[in-house]
């Protein structure tokens, strides 16, 4: 059955979805999810911090900002290419088929670190894995070079709604985020774009953020749904923990709005019970970050995730055949 894809959702419509009785919301999300994802497969993605700390941005949630005082804000040198590729091989052997690499940068700058990034992307793609990069803002030319290297997706999150955004970050505008996403899309690289709940936003803010995502045409290929991990030394260190069922609601609503996007269960999962995580899978999450660290915060370990997926009765890509390598040699 063909799903109706919309790009004209209003914030009011989305808030109405978020406010539905939970069982009704789950039923609607399940109906969409089973049509869009009949095999009910969950993609396993691994995430590595290639360059940690020293970021010039002042994101209130982030342990890597020079404006905050967590234990990881100091500058660390970028990892070399081969150790990164070794981690990618290990991730593949553990079952991941998408390898995401993070740089704590405000923006990509031309030079040796960017050339190394391109080599990493080519190496990951040569293993038959999807490659995703998150490294801040970039130019048209940089986006084109990443596309030529074979980059599958570029992650650049909205974080929150346009209305709540200034309470979370002041060093980059919302419009700059949207312009970065447009450059990535223009280069032919798919978008990985989502946000975070639990940062003091209202339900209306959550609906507004989802409205921005659902208005994109096409929808993002991947939509990470994060719950705040309150890190000591950041402005949000004393923020009350998010309610797990609120994250379930965000997953379900994202699935209804963007039927074919990968809704990725991301940061904050470590604080959720197995039952809440299974509800997220039922609600439409079809990807998880896999491994015990997400950049600088914790995540359930590999064996726990395998058991979780097995108990939930969903098929993960680690049970499938290995993908063929992709030749992404420099032109």
Swiss-Prot record:
<dbReference type="InterPro" id="IPR024177">
    <property type="entry name" value="Biotin_synthase"/>
</dbReference>
<keyword id="KW-0808">Transferase</keyword>
<keyword id="KW-0479">Metal-binding</keyword>
<dbReference type="InterPro" id="IPR006638">
    <property type="entry name" value="Elp3/MiaA/NifB-like_rSAM"/>
</dbReference>
<keyword id="KW-0949">S-adenosyl-L-methionine</keyword>
<dbReference type="InterPro" id="IPR013785">
    <property type="entry name" value="Aldolase_TIM"/>
</dbReference>
<feature type="binding site">
    <location>
        <position position="192"/>
    </location>
    <ligand>
        <name>[2Fe-2S] cluster</name>
    </ligand>
</feature>
<keyword id="KW-0411">Iron-sulfur</keyword>
<dbReference type="InterPro" id="IPR007197">
    <property type="entry name" value="rSAM"/>
</dbReference>
<feature type="binding site">
    <location>
        <position position="62"/>
    </location>
    <ligand>
        <name>[4Fe-4S] cluster</name>
    </ligand>
</feature>
<keyword id="KW-0093">Biotin biosynthesis</keyword>
<comment type="pathway">
    <text>Cofactor biosynthesis; biotin biosynthesis; biotin from 7,8-diaminononanoate: step 2/2.</text>
</comment>
<comment type="function">
    <text>Catalyzes the conversion of dethiobiotin (DTB) to biotin by the insertion of a sulfur atom into dethiobiotin via a radical-based mechanism.</text>
</comment>
<feature type="binding site">
    <location>
        <position position="55"/>
    </location>
    <ligand>
        <name>[4Fe-4S] cluster</name>
    </ligand>
</feature>
<feature type="binding site">
    <location>
        <position position="59"/>
    </location>
    <ligand>
        <name>[4Fe-4S] cluster</name>
    </ligand>
</feature>
<dbReference type="GO" id="GO:0009102">
    <property type="term" value="P:biotin biosynthetic process"/>
</dbReference>
<dbReference type="GO" id="GO:0005506">
    <property type="term" value="F:iron ion binding"/>
</dbReference>
<dbReference type="Pfam" id="PF06968">
    <property type="entry name" value="BATS"/>
</dbReference>
<keyword id="KW-0001">2Fe-2S</keyword>
<comment type="subunit">
    <text>Homodimer.</text>
</comment>
<feature type="binding site">
    <location>
        <position position="264"/>
    </location>
    <ligand>
        <name>[2Fe-2S] cluster</name>
    </ligand>
</feature>
<keyword id="KW-0408">Iron</keyword>
<dbReference type="InterPro" id="IPR010722">
    <property type="entry name" value="BATS_dom"/>
</dbReference>
<feature type="domain" description="Radical SAM core">
    <location>
        <begin position="40"/>
        <end position="269"/>
    </location>
</feature>
<dbReference type="InterPro" id="IPR002684">
    <property type="entry name" value="Biotin_synth/BioAB"/>
</dbReference>
<dbReference type="GO" id="GO:0004076">
    <property type="term" value="F:biotin synthase activity"/>
</dbReference>
<protein>
    <recommendedName>
        <fullName>Biotin synthase</fullName>
        <ecNumber>2.8.1.6</ecNumber>
    </recommendedName>
</protein>
<keyword id="KW-0004">4Fe-4S</keyword>
<feature type="binding site">
    <location>
        <position position="100"/>
    </location>
    <ligand>
        <name>[2Fe-2S] cluster</name>
    </ligand>
</feature>
<comment type="similarity">
    <text>Belongs to the radical SAM superfamily. Biotin synthase family.</text>
</comment>
<dbReference type="GO" id="GO:0051537">
    <property type="term" value="F:2 iron, 2 sulfur cluster binding"/>
</dbReference>
<dbReference type="Pfam" id="PF04055">
    <property type="entry name" value="Radical_SAM"/>
</dbReference>
<dbReference type="GO" id="GO:0051539">
    <property type="term" value="F:4 iron, 4 sulfur cluster binding"/>
</dbReference>
<feature type="binding site">
    <location>
        <position position="132"/>
    </location>
    <ligand>
        <name>[2Fe-2S] cluster</name>
    </ligand>
</feature>
